[in-house]
């Protein structure tokens, strides 16, 4: 996971967002909320996501909203797009999902 130092921070999550890593990711993700009015989460390097990872993203959204901050999901990987489509969650997060063809 990598956080940039831009005006609006971008938090890049790499690797798996599964039950095996959500404990590790939760603290970093929740700590990043509130460092700026908007937090962007870059999901381009997420290789696998399960319901625990989805729940973490939902929690982050709820925490950001409760504190009056914006949370944006960006650059959804194929694994994230597949999970969002399966669970019909694209509308829940409200972020545009751009599907990039595999090279």
Positions of the model-derived regions?
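STAS-like cytosolic regulatory interaction modules
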Residues: 1-49, 59-103
